[in-house]
Amino acid sequence: MLMAKIYLMWGGKPFNEKNYAEAAEIFAKGYAADPKNMEMANFLGICYCELGDFQKGLVIFNEIASQDNPKYAEDVVKAKENIKLYTNNRIAKLQGENDFDGIIAFADEMLAVNPQDALAQKIRLQALFDKKDYAGVIASAEEAAAVQIDEEERSDVYFILGAAYNARTMTPQAIDALSKVTAGTNVAAAQKTVAQLKENAAKANS
């Protein structure tokens, strides 16, 4: 669509100059004129995130990421990369401030946009654990595990859950959760903890 190309060209100059407010205004008009222009959508999402409106950007990135037409494959990859980039940047800032409630609120923002957001569920769970809200971890972990599409990520969730049970001295539940850690970097630690918990339980019962 010729008009969309014109909007891309107009918005490109302020975007490259990091004048995201002006670029967003132009790209928003272009996206409204051509809602199937995923390249424009990605630029608009970036502008919103750079302006501090992460949720608005996330809505757009999720819209792009949901496209299954092969012609949008490159745009889908870029949208997913943008979600990861801006999520990690925001989390790093909040972690640096030890603002666990801020991280939880941020994850809730992401879940408001997409309740099946596996990354948001995991971020939220980790923040609950870091603030020592073990009851919150226990209440949320199964839901978080259910939306993970990767076995390694699911194992990470069960590792956090097992650690929460262990912190509350709920040994059988801790063993059960840690036994579900079957992939990723926490397998050895989970197995070691399970062995230790079983040994301690055996000593207590002898």
Predicted regions and their residues:
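Short coil turns that delineate tetratricopeptide repeat
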Residues: M1, P35, N69, P115, ...
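Register position in tetratricopeptide repeats
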Residues: M9, N16-E17, E50-L51, L85, ...
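Start-of-helix register in tetratricopeptide repeats
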Residues: K5, E39, K78, L85, ...
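Canonical positions in the second alpha-helix
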Residues: K29-G30, E63-I64, E109-M110, E143-V147, ...
